[in-house]
Amino acid sequence: MSSSEEVSWISWFCGLRGNEFFCEVDEDYINDKFNLTGLNEQVPHYRQALDMILDLEPDDDLDDNPNQSDLVEQASEILYGLIHARYILTNRGIGQMLEKFQAGDFGHCPRVYCECQPMLPLGLSDVPGEAMVKLYCPRCMDVYTPKSSRHHHTDGAYFGTGFPHMVFMVHPEYRPKRPASQFVPRLYGFKIHPLAYQIQQQAAANFKAPLRSLSYNNGKR
């Protein structure tokens, strides 16, 4: 960066509206080529994108070609997301995400009996472009769509399918107990038997069958 007052690309990206789920990946992690194995085959303009993430001087061609610059910017976001998915499986990355988890930065479970349990981001696919990020509740162990629409366009592959499970494998002390209570449907104060709905549906089906037959016979007269 040309000025000491300017923030790094990583800080800028993580500070964007809608990117609140991301943590700042350590530059030392990115500079270790081993951690980036295979990403050059997944991301177009890989070299230029990596330079942008690390705040290295861009090629002169980018300054002369605005369209190319936009493509590299898009590639940088994809590359950072894929690096992020790997980084948050490391001890340092897990530590950063746990801080956000404890602060409730990822939101809280909407299920009443989970009692506002903080959630963790989860991808339903590790392939970019297949599914947007979801939120995993470790108490009811179910998955939810983020409450805010600004997170509905964040790719789930940037967090990965195994992140929450890795967190609780490494730090089992953060895993909450399963909820002791479960909602029980009642009518006039009495519990509704699980088979009640099935019996009602069957009764309704049996009631409609004679009516259809009667209507058919009336139509032939």
UniProtKB/Swiss-Prot annotation:
Modified residues (Phosphoserine): S2
SUPFAM superfamilies per record: Casein kinase II beta subunit
Pfam family of the protein (one): CK_II_beta
PROSITE patterns in the cross-refs: CK2_BETA
GO annotation (BP), single: Wnt signaling pathway
Single GO cellular component term: cytoplasm
PTM notes: Phosphorylated by alpha subunit.
Keywords in alphabetical order: Phosphoprotein, Wnt signaling pathway
MF-aspect GO terms: protein kinase regulator activity
Superkingdom of the organism of origin: Eukaryota
Quaternary structure and partners: Tetramer of two alpha and two beta subunits.
Protein family membership: Belongs to the casein kinase 2 subunit beta family.
Alphabetized PANTHER family for the sequence: CASEIN KINASE II SUBUNIT BETA
General function of this protein: Participates in Wnt signaling. Plays a complex role in regulating the basal catalytic activity of the alpha subunit.
Name of the protein described by the UniProt record: Casein kinase II subunit beta
